[in-house]
UniProtKB/Swiss-Prot annotation:
Cell compartment(s), UniProt: Cell membrane
Transmembrane segments: 9-29, 58-78, 85-105, 121-141, 161-181
Topology of this chain in the membrane: Multi-pass membrane protein
Pathway: Lipid metabolism; phospholipid metabolism
InterPro entries: G3P_acylTferase_PlsY
E.C. designation(s): 2.3.1.275
This protein's encoding gene: plsY1
GO-annotated cellular components: plasma membrane
Organism, as annotated: Bacillus cereus (strain ZK / E33L)
Main localisation: membrane
Protein name (Swiss-Prot/TrEMBL): Glycerol-3-phosphate acyltransferase 1
Single GO molecular function: acyl-phosphate glycerol-3-phosphate acyltransferase activity
Amino acid sequence: MSDYMINSMQFLYLVASYLFGNILTAYIVTKWRHNVDIRDEGSGNPGARNMGRVYGKGYFVATFLGDAIKGAIVVSIAKYLFEDSTFVMLTLLAVIIGHIYPVLFKGKGGKGISTFIGGLIAFDYLIALTLVAVFIIFYLIFKGFTKPGLITIACLPLCMILYSYSIVTTILSALIIVLILYVNRE
């Protein structure tokens, strides 16, 4: 992405990434299996955690995988088509925004963690593995998932620097983290 300008094909890909993010696995699964809207069940969040609480572990896994694969698909295609890590990180941001604030669902989406995880694995599996190690350390300290998960996510910009990504790519990763921490603040 020379001079950090995007061309028309990249712009269209960003729009498509956002719209692809609008596909909410939890909504599709509950409509198909139970003919209900998951946003009217449990916490009202169309994400893996609410699916697990309302319908059980199998639904948690299905929703997590569906949303993670969504992020991985967007990032993998962007890596293949554009090869620029800054633009690829921008597509990850777009798909996450699409998941959190889906225009097709009047802005009521999930919290973006599953989509982030899948996209990050596709972006750079070494960073993902580093963050898994960080998560394990904090999991052993806190004995739960939420705090270690959020702390681990917050470590992404440090990993970006450690793995020699550009400052612009690192800033984009930090924006993703701020967004995810914001929607997971309660």
